[in-house]
């Protein structure tokens, strides 16, 4: 409760000082806003060609307590108590000498305050002089919590920015992961917040669900279906639907049509295996009739009749990713 009160006092100050293109843990901002900003920075023919993909090692765990105490406008004694409160891991209490309070509602704001200022650092490199002329370096920072990218016209300008970011972060007790912090050409593409962002041969920039997240999602539906191999069909649908709609809503703002179609097919195959396992001795036609319903344009849908909590008859149907409108 005390943290919530302090957060109410701290948030307006943090908002005033916040980087313009920081999108994580801030009111009225989302991942969709972050990807939209990246699109604006990279989609034109004349846009930056290079991207610095930043990866901060265990950001929440390593922020310097000294830096926070010196820089956060909040009661120092109270902040010191929270920072030293420690964490309980596997029922063992550990004292903490660095990082923000685990699970504390104030932690995301403290992390944002720590990383604000990166945008000003990047902006210092906005232009370069060459043969008496001034050129734009096309530098932009987009940050979501501790994930960030910096765009740039050349690899060299991003190398310079990276060197300065290393110093900026060191002051705050943080460091970049050497193996995960990469400078990538936009034609090779990069992953950010579960999206893959890449400019193709025709000059078109496409944002799609990342391969890694597609795989993760297919594995998670497989796990649900496998664990529920002897459950009722209505329960399987009840478990899968929130998972499917959550994933579809996250990716509905980008080029997801093909991926949605592919994953719908994977889920269909997973459920077909689930139904065949239950009825080894029955024909595919019998199984299809029992577990699938034909719905005009939508084709075959995994569904059945059941009863709701009040005992009323209800039709239970599996949501399909492709039925989510792409915005």
Q: Model regions: which residues?
A:
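Charged boundary/loop elements
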Residues: 8-24
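Duplex nucleic acid-engaging cores and interfaces of nucleic-acid transaction enzymes
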Residues: 1-7, 31, 35, 39
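Extended C-terminal regions of large enzymes
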Residues: 270, 275-327
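Right-hand nucleic-acid polymerase module
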Residues: 224-285
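A conserved non-catalytic segment of reverse transcriptases
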Residues: 84, 172-239, 243-245
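Conserved polymerase palm-domain catalytic core
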Residues: 20-21, 26, 33-189
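A generic structural signal for alpha-helix starts
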Residues: 1, 155-156, 258
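Short, residue-level hotspots on alpha-helical faces of the histone-fold
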Residues: 4, 8, 12, 66, ...
């Amino acid at each position: 409760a005390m943290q919530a009160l302090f957060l109410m006092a701290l948030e307006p100050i943090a908002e005033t000082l916040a980087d313009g293109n920081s999108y994580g843990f801030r009111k009225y901002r989302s991942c969709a806003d972050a990807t939209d900003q990246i699109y604006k920075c990279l989609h034109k023919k004349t846009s930056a060609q290079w991207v610095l993909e930043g990866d901060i090692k265990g950001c929440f765990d390593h922020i310097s307590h000294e830096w926070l105490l010196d820089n956060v406008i909040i009661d120092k004694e109270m902040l010191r108590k929270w920072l030293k409160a420690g964490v309980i891991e596997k029922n063992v209490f550990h004292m903490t000498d660095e990082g923000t309070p685990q699970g504390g509602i104030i932690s995301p704001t403290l992390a944002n305050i720590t990383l604000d200022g990166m945008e000003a650092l990047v902006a210092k490199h906005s232009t370069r002089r060459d043969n008496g002329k001034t050129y734009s370096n096309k530098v932009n920072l987009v940050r979501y919590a501790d994930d960030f990218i910096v765009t740039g016209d050349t690899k060299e300008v991003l190398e310079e920015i990276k060197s300065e970011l290393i110093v900026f972060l060191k002051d705050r007790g943080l460091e970049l992961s050497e193996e995960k912090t990469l400078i990538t050409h936009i034609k090779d593409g990069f992953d950010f917040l579960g999206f893959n962002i890449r400019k193709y041969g025709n000059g078109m920039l496409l944002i799609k669900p990342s391969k890694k997240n597609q795989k993760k999602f297919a594995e998670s539906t497989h796990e649900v279906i496998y664990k529920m191999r002897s459950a009722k069909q209505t329960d399987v649908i009840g478990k899968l639907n929130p998972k499917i709609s959550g994933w579809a809503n996250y990716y509905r703002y980008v080029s997801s049509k093909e991926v949605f179609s592919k994953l719908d097919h994977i889920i269909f195959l997973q459920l077909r295996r689930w139904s065949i396992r239950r009825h080894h001795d029955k024909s595919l036609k019998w199984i299809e009739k029992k577990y699938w319903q034909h719905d005009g344009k939508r084709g075959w849908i995994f569904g059945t009749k059941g009863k709701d909590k009040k005992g009323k008859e209800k039709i239970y149907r599996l949501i399909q990713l492709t039925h989510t409108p792409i915005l």
